[in-house]
């Protein structure tokens, strides 16, 4: 058994798998858990309306396989953001949040990862920020009532691209049910002092996403997806050394989007082995 649970993102696995098949495959590839995606597509949004029988079936599959789903990546708020100028969109954002909390409670999901966007497809201004703040405060209250953790991901846009920026929201909301979910790729791409950022948030980190990225520069917008491990700007050995010094005890999630790749299984096994090698190099025993 690992000292630190290592999971794989659902979108790294073939899309046409059933949930029992997905869990078995993750286990056979050496992973401890799968992170569920509820994104902005109608297909994945429909999970929020699963029947009791569908929910029970997935819980049974987790028990039978020994592979859990401790976290949900709720990126549906890109399409339906709390900060939208459209009241109907904001109402839909709240409905999605309520249903996601209920699904998490039923499935035993402990952490819902929120995207740190006030808006995504609309222009940002002080109004979108204020409406996002109101929606987020409401969401944290709902999650607290169900004992479900909300953790904001450090993002690929400037709005929430550091733990330092997240910390201001933490101070405002002041809830034990509101934490941070750092993505070391995003943290690195924006030129942050990554060790200092991790130290700043260490007591509030719910889990950590592992991916590589290309940096944002004056000549480049960066690349936040599909960068092979070892070909980007992330200093994984340095990060694992920092986390070892900080006595980080949480889990890690390898974030990949290989569900349409020719050999997704081979790619995720290679990614796991590469990450484990960097951990070993850093003296961080996974």
Curated annotation (Swiss-Prot):
Class of enzymatic activity (EC top level): isomerase
Catalytic activity: L-ribulose 5-phosphate = L-xylulose 5-phosphate
Pfam short name (any one): AP_endonuc_2
GO molecular function annotations of the record: DNA binding; intramolecular oxidoreductase activity, interconverting aldoses and ketoses; L-ribulose-5-phosphate 3-epimerase activity; zinc ion binding
Keyword Cell wall biogenesis/degradation attached: no
Signal peptide (residue range): none
Domain of life from the UniProt record: Bacteria
EC number: 5.1.3.22
Biological process per Gene Ontology, one example term: L-ascorbic acid metabolic process
InterPro entries membership: AP_endonuc_2 (IPR001719), L-Ru-5P_3-Epase (IPR004560), Sugar_Epim/Isomerase (IPR050417), Xyl_isomerase-like_sf (IPR036237), Xyl_isomerase-like_TIM-brl (IPR013022)
Keyword Transmembrane: no
Disulfide bond residue pairs: none
Keyword terms, alphabetized: Carbohydrate metabolism, Isomerase
Gene3D superfamilies: Divalent-metal-dependent TIM barrel enzymes
NCBIfam families: hxl6Piso_put (TIGR00542), PRK13209.1 (NF009688), PRK13210.1 (NF009689)
Matches recorded under PANTHER family: ISOMERASE (PTHR43489), L-RIBULOSE-5-PHOSPHATE 3-EPIMERASE SGBU-RELATED (PTHR43489:SF1)
Function noted in UniProt: Catalyzes the isomerization of L-xylulose-5-phosphate to L-ribulose-5-phosphate (Potential). May be involved in the utilization of 2,3-diketo-L-gulonate.
Family under the similarity heading: Belongs to the L-ribulose-5-phosphate 3-epimerase family.
Protein's name in the database: Putative L-ribulose-5-phosphate 3-epimerase SgbU
Organism in which the protein naturally occurs: Escherichia coli (strain K12)
Gene transcribed to yield this protein: sgbU
């Amino acid at each position: 058994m690992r000292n630190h649970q290592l999971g794989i993102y659902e979108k790294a696995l073939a899309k046409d798998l059933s949930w029992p098949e997905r869990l078995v495959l993750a286990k056979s590839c050496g992973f401890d858990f799968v992170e569920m995606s509820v994104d902005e597509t109608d297909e994945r949004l429909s999970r929020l309306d699963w029947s009791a029988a569908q929910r029970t079936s997935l819980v049974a599959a987790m028990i039978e396989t020994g592979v859990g789903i401790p976290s949900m990546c709720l990126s549906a708020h890109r399409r339906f953001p709390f900060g939208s100028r459209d009241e109907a969109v904001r109402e839909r954002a709240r409905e999605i949040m309520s249903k996601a909390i209920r699904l998490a409670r039923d499935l035993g999901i402990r952490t819902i990862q929120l995207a740190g966007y006030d808006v995504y497809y609309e222009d940002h201004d002080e109004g979108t920020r204020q409406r996002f703040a109101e929606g987020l405060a409401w969401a944290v209250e709902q999650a607290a009532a169900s004992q479900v953790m909300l953790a904001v991901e450090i993002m690929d846009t400037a709005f929430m691209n550091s733990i330092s920026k997240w910390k201001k929201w933490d101070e405002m909301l002041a809830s034990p049910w509101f934490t941070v979910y750092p993505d070391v790729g995003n943290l690195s791409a924006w030129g942050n002092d990554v060790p200092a950022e991790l130290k700043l948030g260490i007591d509030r980190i719910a889990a950590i996403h592992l991916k590589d990225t290309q940096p944002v520069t004056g000549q480049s917008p960066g690349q936040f997806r599909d960068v092979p491990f070892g070909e980007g700007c992330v200093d994984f050995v340095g990060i694992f050394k920092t986390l070892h010094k900080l006595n980080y005890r949480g889990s890690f999630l390898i974030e990949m989007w290989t569900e349409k790749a020719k050999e997704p299984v081979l790619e995720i096994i290679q990614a796991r082995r590469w990450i484990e090698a960097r951990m070993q190099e850093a003296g961080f025993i996974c």
